[in-house]
């Protein structure tokens, strides 16, 4: 994913992709290449595969308002009905944004202020989970949870009372991309495989199976506008994209700082 690929590029662990030899690379839309510049600034090393946002999945039968602000995750009315991500950078998103800080900050003061906010929230949190958030929300185990958009869409297939929202203050938008490891034994085969994944019928099959947002315009052109309008998790409006930020790789020192603060939260 985005910032890890950025780390691999900085560490010289990936090969440039021979886009000129790829027949179907043109299926990837321009705006997804623009997103990719945040971690592959020269657009040399990656091929976008899926993308999405981080937001709040909520149960309309358990909540009496739409949680369109990150402040909802601090609402004492829903004590023990809130699920957070068991992931340092994801869980810091709401706290940093509510403090008017970037989700890519490396400032220790800003991060400690966000930690304090998360510590204040902790008594309200039912659990810190990852993939299980989708299942718990689908089974009415909590009123709301911090979740990836694709997981939210899957949960909604099993529970008609679930809705997804990207809070008005903004959030993280992420791009999962392919890259070719340096020193691989079959570079030409790797490029052909990436091209195969960009082919419209293959990309459609993968989209229908994974059901995360696709950057493949040939796939998007085959989806009814009504279907797009009915799933804001998979097909977010441009205004949602514009208020989101992509994670950057922050370096070893910042990574260690985030992890130390995360440990402080877990033992608080």
Positions of PLM-derived features:
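Periplasmic-binding protein-like
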Residues: 111-120, 126, 158-182, 228
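Extracytoplasmic ligand-binding site segments that recognize negatively charged/polar headgroups
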Residues: 1-141
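Conserved C-terminal helix/tail region of periplasmic/extracytoplasmic solute-binding proteins
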Residues: 238-268
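A ligand-binding cleft/hinge motif common to bilobed small-molecule-binding domains
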Residues: 5-7, 144-161
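A bilobed periplasmic-binding-protein/Venus flytrap-type ligand-binding module shared by bacterial periplasmic
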Residues: 55-62, 96-100, 174-186, 197, ...
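Short beta-strand->loop
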Residues: 15-26, 46-47, 160-172, 181-184
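Alpha-helix capping/helix-boundary segments
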Residues: 4, 133, 151-152, 202
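Mature extracytoplasmic/periplasmic domains
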Residues: 181-242
């Amino acid at each position: 994913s985005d910032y890890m690929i950025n780390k691999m590029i900085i560490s010289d662990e990936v090969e440039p992709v021979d886009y000129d030899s790829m027949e179907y690379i043109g299926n990837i839309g321009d705006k997804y290449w623009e997103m990719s510049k945040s971690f592959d600034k020269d657009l040399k090393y990656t091929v976008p595969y899926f993308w999405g946002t981080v937001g709040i999945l909520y149960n309309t039968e358990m909540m009496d308002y739409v949680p369109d602000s990150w402040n909802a995750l601090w609402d004492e009315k829903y004590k023990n009905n809130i699920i957070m991500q068991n992931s340092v950078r994801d869980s810091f998103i709401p706290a940093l944004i509510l403090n008017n800080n970037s989700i890519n900050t490396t400032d220790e003061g800003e991060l400690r202020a966000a930690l304090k906010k998360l510590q204040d929230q902790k008594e309200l949190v039912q659990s810190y989970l990852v993939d299980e958030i989708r299942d718990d929300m689908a089974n009415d185990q909590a009123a709301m949870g911090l979740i990836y958009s694709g997981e939210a869409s899957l949960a909604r297939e099993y529970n008609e009372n679930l809705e997804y929202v990207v809070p008005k203050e903004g959030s993280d938008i992420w791009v999962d991309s392919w890259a070719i490891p340096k020193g691989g034994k079959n570079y030409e085969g790797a490029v052909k495989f990436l091209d195969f994944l960009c082919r419209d019928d293959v990309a459609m099959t993968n989209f229908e199976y994974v059901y995360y947002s696709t950057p493949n315009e040939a796939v998007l052109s085959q989806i009814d506008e009504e279907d797009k309008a009915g799933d804001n998790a998979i097909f977010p409006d441009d205004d949602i994209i514009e208020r989101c930020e992509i994670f950057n790789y922050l370096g070893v020192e910042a990574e260690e700082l985030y992890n130390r603060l995360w440990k402080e939260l877990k033992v608080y």
